[in-house]
């Protein structure tokens, strides 16, 4: 490298350092709020992040998602199609059916809780209490009394006089148990016609001496065409929605 090139390189470096010096010397400040409100805002932020991380679990616990996704899973098992429809399709269908069933509850929670809280009209505690009311009413409408009594006894808490005063730590697991029971009841009814098809196909194969041919392979097309002819997806989706009185 020539002496002239070295001088030009040194001049460029010095120019860069002189230009970057004032920028590097500027103070960097972050506004965390005024006075004692910092701790409260940090706690609110942590609580918000926690709620967002638990949102899928909350969706499963307090909505109709549990019953719907279990019924769809049992339906796929009854049909004998291990991977069709795939899990992503089943979960997506269950999610949108849940949004359809829970639409009024979500709208009420937003109008009475989230919107006033966003406008600064109510506190976070008031917003949670108002937003949880429609979901509490939904769970009370669909929970079994036997399951409520079970978890009330396990908690060893005095039973409230009004159903609206039942704690969520009692109501939520009782509701989930009730949903699983109803999902299995619906699944049993879905299994019956496909079980009959399997038995008929197995009997025909045995009478023809074709015992080496798996009956499941032969019965699968018959179960699929039967499900299509009776418009099975419409019946299942409609029955699931109507089971909530919608």
Task: Describe the predicted segments one by one.
Residues 24-246:
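Hydrophobic alpha-helical segments and their helix-loop boundaries in membrane
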């Amino acid at each position: 490298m020539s002496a002239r090139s070295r001088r030009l390189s040194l001049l460029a470096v010095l120019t860069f350092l002189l230009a970057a010096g004032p920028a590097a010397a500027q103070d960097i400040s972050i506004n965390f709020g005024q006075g004692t409100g910092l701790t409260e805002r940090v706690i609110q932020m942590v609580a918000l992040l926690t709620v967002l991380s638990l949102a899928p679990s909350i969706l499963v616990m307090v909505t109709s998602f549990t019953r719907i996704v279990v019924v769809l899973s049992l339906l796929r098992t009854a049909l004998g199609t291990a991977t069709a429809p795939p899990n992503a399709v089943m979960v997506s269908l269950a999610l949108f059916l849940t949004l359809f069933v829970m639409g009024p509850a979500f709208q009420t929670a937003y109008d009475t809780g989230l919107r006033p809280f966003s406008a600064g009209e109510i506190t976070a505690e008031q917003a949670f209490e108002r937003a949880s009311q429609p979901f509490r009413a939904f769970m009370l409408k669909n929970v079994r009394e036997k399951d409520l009594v079970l978890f009330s006894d396990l908690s060893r808490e005095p039973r409230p006089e009004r159903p609206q005063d039942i704690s969520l730590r009692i109501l939520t697991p009782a509701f989930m148990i009730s949903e699983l029971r109803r999902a299995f009841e619906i699944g049993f009814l879905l299994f019956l016609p496909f079980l009959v098809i399997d038995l008929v196909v197995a009997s025909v194969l045995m009478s023809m001496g074709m015992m080496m041919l798996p009956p499941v392979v032969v019965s699968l097309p018959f179960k699929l065409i039967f499900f299509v002819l009776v418009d099975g997806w419409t019946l299942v989706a409609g029955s699931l929605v109507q089971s909530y009185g919608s």
